[in-house]
């Protein structure tokens, strides 16, 4: 645990940097086990330490609960391990990695040296672009995304909150 948030630490050889990984799953499924192979592979391939963060899931935990877990774990990880930190995640986890990077500016400066966002949900306009072109994609439809948003938010998505949707931030300066 880091900051009281369940986490799993992977270590292998030289520890030049730390990767803090947030799993995907639409904020409703996933955890330390579902993404164990990904985190182990990142550690084995890069030699970096990897911490997998097991944030609370909806509907039991609604926004900002999952963000608070990610932020609390990040703060404890940053305090425990000096050096470079790369924030990473897939899907919902990519959202959390980006949200933590935005929120860290002015709070924990200079530690985050990169973001690896794998098909992240960042809060784009669902009325245009690939949201329209791929609205009925076989793996994840726009209707699925709307469902996850309603469950994650407890039925009321926040307006313009970059902790919820990082693209709602008005300042992208100082981000890795």
Give the residues covered by each predicted segment.
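Alpha/beta-hydrolase superfamily serine-hydrolase fold, recognizing
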Residues: 2-176
């Amino acid at each position: 645990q880091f900051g009281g948030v369940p986490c799993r630490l992977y270590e292998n050889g030289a520890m030049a940097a730390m990767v803090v990984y947030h799993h995907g799953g639409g904020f409703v499924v996933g955890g330390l086990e579902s993404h164990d192979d990904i985190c182990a592979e990142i550690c084995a391939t890069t030699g970096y330490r990897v911490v997998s963060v097991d944030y609370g899931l909806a509907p039991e935990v609604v926004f900002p609960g999952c963000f608070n877990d990610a932020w609390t774990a990040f703060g404890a990880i940053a305090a425990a391990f000096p050096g470079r930190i790369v924030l990473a995640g897939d899907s919902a986890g990519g959202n959390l990695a980006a949200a933590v990077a935005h929120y860290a500016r002015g709070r924990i400066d200079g530690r985050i040296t990169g973001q690896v966002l794998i098909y992240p949900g960042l809060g784009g306009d669902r009325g245009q672009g690939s949201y329209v072109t791929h609205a009925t994609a076989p793996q994840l439809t726009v209707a699925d995304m709307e469902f996850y948003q309603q469950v994650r938010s407890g039925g009321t998505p926040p307006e313009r909150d970059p902790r919820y949707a990082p693209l709602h931030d008005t300042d992208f300066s100082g981000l890795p």
